[in-house]
Amino acid sequence: MRIMKCGIAAMLLAAAGCADDSMPGGICTASFATITVTVVDRQSQPVTGASVTATLVRTGETLVPTTLMLSVPGTYALVDDGSTHLIRRSGDAVQASISKGSQSVTADYVVAVADGCHISKVSGPDTVSLK
């Protein structure tokens, strides 16, 4: 019986450590969400080495992804769970500016933290083409 009480107490303590202040009583998973964009050229080939900047339109703040480099050529992280404290649960506009050499494109996104834990894309393109 004593072992069972200790086990239950340990589980409750572990779960309490995962609770998110913006979601009273809620538990966040250990997953780490990232919103990505694939950048292609006029021939629909992946573009590597592009400069990608995501800006939170409401504040003008640059959102810096905390994820490591992605291993898919032409795919870039825009926003990840490292920015959940900046994004409204109901959603925020994010503008992505992407360039390489003389070519550039901007794309508009809406991202949210609807569950109080993880970034999710409400709208915006999966792929953009440099022009």
What are these regions (language model features)?
Residues 35, 48-52, 92-94:
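Short beta-strand/loop motifs in extracellular/secreted proteins, especially
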